Amino acid sequence: MSAAVAASSGAPAADVEKGAAAADANVDGGGAPAAAAASGEGVVSAVVRRWRRQDLLEKSGSALRVAAWAFSLLAFVVMGANDHGDWRQFEHYEEYRYVVAIGVLAFIYTTLQLVRHGVRLTGGQDLQGKVAVLVDFAGDQVTAYLLMSAVSAAIPITNRMREGADNVFTDSSAASISMAFFAFLCLALSALVSGFKLAKQTYI
């Protein structure tokens, strides 16, 4: 009698264990697709964030080069027009001729960079990824350095002239130097953007 009772009480316990095991299996089986879906969403989100960051960097670099283009144009145009006769002619001063030369160089460089950007926007062929970023970084740095050297060379002579005579010639010289300095700032910031893009470049 006691054996029968034990057998009958053991059967439900075994059924309960089997049911629990089946439930665990169902949970595990349903969790795998959910984990895979979550992982896929994470990858997609990371890719979207990367695209947005690249787009922001591209727009920032282009905007800074547009500003540098405008400032460099003003720098050499204002200095080139700074001709008021006698000693008040920029051609008489090596420092001012240097400002004009570097302003023209910066203008040409930024023009070429903007043309490259336009080619990319229209789906044209540009340099390969890493090479393009290296060209941007090196070009921005070198041009910014040259602009800063031109500004540094022209400031002392302008200050000495203004101590003796503050006139339209010295004012125009100061305005040109200021434009060259703003062009330097824009290209220096653009070099930082290019450097960040170079550091984040993938090597696959």
From Swiss-Prot:
Side of membrane Cytoplasmic, spans: 1-60, 120-130, 197-204
GO cellular component: plasma membrane
Family of the protein in this entry: Belongs to the Casparian strip membrane proteins (CASP) family.
Pfam families in alphabetical order: CASP_dom
Protein name: CASP-like protein 4B4
Summary of subunit composition and partner proteins: Homodimer and heterodimers.
Transmembrane segments: 61-81, 99-119, 131-151, 176-196
UniProt KW keywords: Cell membrane, Membrane, Transmembrane, Transmembrane helix
UniProt source species: Oryza sativa subsp. japonica (Rice)
